Amino acid sequence: MGACEPPNFSWVSEGRLAALGMPREPGHYRFLLAQGVRHLVSLTERPPPHHGCCPALQLHRFRVPDFTPPAPQQIRSFLQLVEEANARGEAVAVHCMLGHGRTGTMLACYLARAQGLSGSDAIREIRRLRPGSIETREQEQAVIHFCQQAGAGEDSKEL
């Protein structure tokens, strides 16, 4: 069986961090490996199907209920994982069910840190790159709170 692109796949930082919806078949994992992805971060409460089919792709589980934001410690752990993997030349991909809400929240925090953006600017940028990202006010607030805690700029304006 060959590789096939997973749903809603795109690079947020080429060769470093990608996003996608839930991978559902072995070809999706082979596609990720072919793209240089070595770490798959799953934000869903259940593990993705067939995740054991490609042992070279390490699965990292961060259980976040649908339509809720990741906890601050989950965001920090995710960003550390991305930083450490990238330092070794390894790409990371992150997914939730559709690759929008929980995934978008993590990606906006990544962009805020990587590009020095405020929370609202990071949210706008991830929505430009991946339309539909960040689905709830609580997810928006998680990004803004992360940025305030990280000193990435004062940010309390409405989006």
Task: Give the ranges of each region predicted by the language model.
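Short cysteine clusters
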Residues: 96
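Conserved G/P- and acidic residue-centered "switch" motifs that form tight phosphate/ATP-binding loops
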Residues: 99
